[in-house]
Amino acid sequence: ILCARSENGENAVGKFILIGDHKQLPAVVLQNTEQSEIYDEGLRSAGLKNLKDSLFERLYRTLQTSSEDLFPDSASVSAPNHRSFDMLCKQGRMHPEVAHFANQAFYEGRLLPVGLPHQMEDNQDVQRMVFLPSEPEPQGTSAKVNHSEARIVARIAADVYQQYGGTFDGMRTLGIITPYRSQIALIRKEIVKMGIPELNSILVDTVERFQGSERDVIIYSFCVNYPYQLRFLSNLTEENGVFIDCLLYTSP
């Protein structure tokens, strides 16, 4: 898009539109941030600072920090200082109570509900986001499993099934997210113990696998046994992805 040139040496692409959200999950890159870092000053001055950054994010960041409009033909009377980019502020997926954290932490409070029926429900008896404590694993055991969390998750899944009754749909009602494969296997094992065959069809996976899908209820098992594990969960775009994947309420 940016490099194509016409026979006259001018930009071959007169206008293009990119729609996305760089504050949600990026593409999966095997290298860590240090390995993909770019140190060439010429490239860094052009906005290319890390190979993990998408073209969308690089352009957005450049336009935010640039004092001049890179695309002068896109002048807007309503936003003269940001003529080449804007934000879509209406979301129709989450109830406002679920969206509140992501809205404040990632979008500066600018997200507004469309006003769809599931967003307008006002049930004072429902707490739409709940944080439950769990016991860490004993010293010397694997940091990538937590039996206490797995049992809690299985019990919540069973409660959700009982609450929904005949309307429970394993592919739409409930999803369980956790960062480690070992914890996924442990949660599935605990769910089988519940003796509810319908729960065997629910998706238990990492947040990357949930990208683009949604559920009424999301259970997030952090599986943090030691303080050092917190830095592995510090990717804010992943945490944002967890909230965006939820429709009605979240029960970690």
Spans of model-derived segments:
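Conserved helicase motor core of SF1/SF2 NTP-dependent helicases
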Residues: I1-S251
